[in-house]
Amino acid sequence: MNDRLVLFGTKGGPRLIKGGSWPTSQALVLNGNVYVIDAGLGVTRQFIEAGFTYDQLESIFITHHHSDHNLELGGLIYTSWVGAPAHKINIFGPSGLKKLITHFIESQSFDINIRILDEGLHDIRECFSCTEYTQGVIFEDDKLKVEALRV
């Protein structure tokens, strides 16, 4: 698989218009691994439409807490959970990320508990790790180095 950047959405702001672009979200593909940058509305559908699988999803990076960058983070986490990736997904974002995810999971607790009981899924909190960052290098592996700065 070729290294590439896939643009899921390029529109600023959360308002949608017929025939318009989706809000901000991209996927950086390196050696077959997918790193999602921002989770604007539509990211989950665009991820699947691009032909990716949840097993390819390595990390999610949220650049800042505007709705056009994080509105569908919960949905992406949730669908990756029911898609049963073979590994933990790393999620990085600025201060407030853990609260955002915790509140989403709490809002879906009824459905999550039913799926754990009926479908035998593991706890959703076990499918990801969450790291809040400030500035500097926030992630580095053998394929990618990510540095955050205040703008």
Where are these regions (language model features)?
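Binuclear metal-dependent hydrolase catalytic cores
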Residues: 1-151
